[in-house]
């Protein structure tokens, strides 16, 4: 498996995510702030889900955190809720619409797990 958050890792996510069909267009952006700005975005739609490198033109929701926080959340050492509460994770955008994507995001999580992707 490629190094987490690398361009190769994003490509593996994209390949696995294509099996998931969304309901509506919705873009979720992830930004990791450190010495280098790492970003990717998940594009949900009525077609295959895509994961693309870089920042989206118009994300619906953006999650911003430093690399240590992103790693801790990904490894299960820190919950997103705790990171939000202590200010280590910042969420901006249409959070009410994000909540409506719960079912699609659960399918995406299952597809990534089935493909052995450590997201």
Task: Identify the meaning behind each predicted range.
Residues 1-119:
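Feature captures hydrophobic
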